[in-house]
């Protein structure tokens, strides 16, 4: 899913009077960090819901998890769920290939989200490299954590 889930929550929150930036959403997520629920980001219910926020809450409800109430809780559920998805995917790749990987390269728009990159590092136990790619330009940054 990538940042699809986060982008949809941001779109829902934005009104004529207020447009939330990603740093503002990250701040909300940080305030709610520690909220325990995790969703399967690849579940079909997140492909094109009328409300991503409601889809996250309903998934938590139907799987017997704590239901996020605040937008910060919804955001941290998504961040933790994306990081869990990275962890699961890396484990699957390691099992299929018979290799152990020591690092993950995050490319595209998501690499700019250091909160997500920190979550990926925490969940996977791997080094995370954030790489911005535009045409032939590649900038690699190892997280200073």
Stretches with model-predicted labels:
Residues 1-104, 112-145:
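Active-site core segments that coordinate phosphate-bearing ligands/cofactors
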